[in-house]
UniProtKB/Swiss-Prot annotation:
Antimicrobial peptide active against plant pathogenic fungi and Gram-negative and -positive bacteria. Disulfide bonds join 3-18, 12-24, 17-31, 35-39. Not glycosylated. This is Antimicrobial peptide 1. Gene3D superfamilies: Endochitinase-like. One of its GO terms (biological process) is defense response to bacterium. Pfam families: Chitin_bind_1. It comes from Fagopyrum esculentum (Common buckwheat). Keywords: Antibiotic, Antimicrobial, Chitin-binding, Disulfide bond, Fungicide, Plant defense. Residues 1-40 form the Chitin-binding type-1 domain. GO terms for molecular function: chitin binding. InterPro entries: Chitin-bd_1 (IPR001002), Chitin-binding_1_CS (IPR018371), Endochitinase-like_sf (IPR036861).
């Protein structure tokens, strides 16, 4: 599911990070630069 600006402001389940592209994940690619929510 999409999150952040691309997902209408939605956050990710389970505390996952929302990447700059609006996708949920737990790796630095998602949690690092550009992260939109639940960032590390």
């Amino acid at each position: 599911a999409q999150c952040g600006a691309q997902g209408g402001g939605a956050t990710c389940p389970g505390g996952l990070c929302c990447s700059q592209w609006g996708w949920c994940g737990s790796t630095p690619k998602y949690c690092g630069a550009g992260c939109q929510s639940n960032c590390k």
